[in-house]
């Protein structure tokens, strides 16, 4: 029985192994983020809701949870990698972040290291990501933390904040991200 720590250096990453929302056009990208509640840095792999009534992307709207997955814009491939991309408020002239949200359905599979909490510096190590007991991966499931939009382990320390009525994800495999960091391949099961 071993414990695998899934932390990250830099920003969270997503590898869209099989996200059907991309193919079927279930993508929304017209509303700005409510930075007062979601912060000034939006990472790939986080979840949010499309709140048409307030005209914002936030964590409390009446809509479904959708995966934030934006096109990575890295301008120096010699010095930058997937971990260096996030949507940062100060990078936009109007100060508004307009992310791309993708609907996930049962059976969708993607790989990520986006767990726990936001990384506010691209050089900071988020060492308190999640610890996974890899002796029985079928027993580990993830739900969305309603207060942060990040995935967390069902039955873990943040269990009271999890939306267990929303999407639930199971581990397919402990994996490695493109830059060598630990990651988890997930499949939506509910």
Q: Language-model segments: what does each one mean?
A:
Residues 1-190:
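Surface-exposed, low-hydrophobicity beta-strand/loop segments enriched in small/polar/acidic residues
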């Amino acid at each position: 029985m071993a414990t695998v720590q899934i932390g990250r250096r830099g920003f969270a990453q997503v590898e869209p192994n099989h996200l059907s929302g991309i193919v079927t056009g279930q993508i929304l990208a017209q509303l700005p983020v409510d930075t007062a509640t979601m912060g000034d840095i939006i990472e790939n792999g986080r979840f949010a809701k499309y709140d048409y009534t307030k005209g914002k992307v936030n964590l409390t709207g009446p809509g479904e949870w959708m995966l934030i997955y934006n096109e990575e814009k890295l301008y120096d491939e010699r010095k930058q990698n997937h971990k260096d991309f996030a949507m940062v408020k100060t990078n936009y002239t109007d100060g508004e972040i307009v992310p791309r949200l993708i609907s996930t359905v049962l059976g969708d599979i993607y790989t990520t290291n986006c767990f726990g909490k936001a990384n506010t510096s691209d050089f900071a190590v988020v060492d308190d990501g999640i610890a996974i007991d890899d002796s029985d991966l079928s027993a580990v499931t993830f739900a969305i933390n309603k207060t942060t939009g990040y995935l967390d382990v069902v039955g873990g320390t943040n269990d009271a904040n999890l939306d267990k009525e929303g999407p639930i994800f199971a581990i397919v495999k402990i994996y490695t991200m493109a830059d060598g960091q630990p990651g988890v391949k997930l499949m939506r099961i509910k």
